[in-house]
Amino acid sequence: MKYRKLIILVLSILIILPVSTLDGHHIANADDDSPKKLKYKENSALALNYHRVRKANFLNNFIYFFSSSKEIKNYSVSQSQFESQIKWLKSHDAKFLTLKEFLYYKKKGKFPKRSVWINFDDMDETIYENAYPILKKYKIPATGFIITGHVGEENFHNLDMISKKELKEMYKTGLWEFETHTHDLHNLSKNNKSKLMKASEATIIKDLNKSEKYLTKNFKKSQKTIAYPYGLMNDDKLPVIKKAGLKYGFSLEEKAVTPNSNDYYIPRILISDDAFEHLIKRWDGFHEKD
């Protein structure tokens, strides 16, 4: 009877998963199954973006291997995979940067060799439970892009969001910085268009000002950056983003960052196990001689 219930539960989850959490994430070349390799430029850095870090238990592993959900395959790694990736980066002498350092080197025009900046979008409970302890263990800095109007919310697009108490605990370690993922514009319309890109100028400015106020009140400082929901932005909305006082914007694209990367389209590589194996491990920056 116990196993029968488990099988029914698993089958139910597999049916539900194709209509998954925060549907509509987009990344350039994400649907291309051809062999990949990042173009290498000597003066460059890697911005590694994560969304979910799931527990490596039987149920989650079963779902991962048998589900066709892109949310599961492309937007999550297991806790064991995440730790393995961090250990690989450390063993290959990655220079882990804070967001402040990352932006400083970009503006200065020269990145240290093997520069890596770790960041997370949405900030649901899986980050606190499964990624935070590993980063703390290895003393790796990271940045979390928060949907500030939904902190602590249960069942936000089927996700339990991290609480303010947990965010403050992470911040006090000195390893975490927090930036905006909007206050309440992280949604898709019926035609799969980002709510941020459909909103009026007044709505966007009001939303981003609310988010900035939340960040400065709770975490004292902000680098004035935004990770666009779903990694999507267009040129028509950039004047509004700038008018709201933001200095940098982050997209999702399989490219290394150079000093010449557009400040409002800074590419971050969405990390799955496949992306790490085929993009990050093969990046020439980890194989050049000093």
UniProtKB/Swiss-Prot annotation:
Keywords: Cell wall, Hydrolase, Secreted, Signal. Residues 114-290 form the NodB homology domain. GO terms for molecular function: hydrolase activity, acting on carbon-nitrogen (but not peptide) bonds, in linear amides. It is an enzyme of class 3 (hydrolase). Its EC number is 3.5.1.-. The keyword Ribosomal protein does not apply. It is found in: Secreted, Cell wall. Residues 1-28 form the signal peptide. Its main location: secreted. Pfam families: Polysacc_deac_1. Belongs to the polysaccharide deacetylase family. Catalyzes the N-deacetylation of poly-beta-1,6-N-acetyl-D-glucosamine (PNAG, also referred to as PIA), a biofilm adhesin polysaccharide. N-deacetylation is crucial for attachment of the polysaccharide to the bacterial cell surface; it leads to the introduction of positive charges in the otherwise neutral PIA polymer, allowing electrostatic interactions. This is Poly-beta-1,6-N-acetyl-D-glucosamine N-deacetylase. It comes from Staphylococcus aureus (strain N315). The gene is icaB.
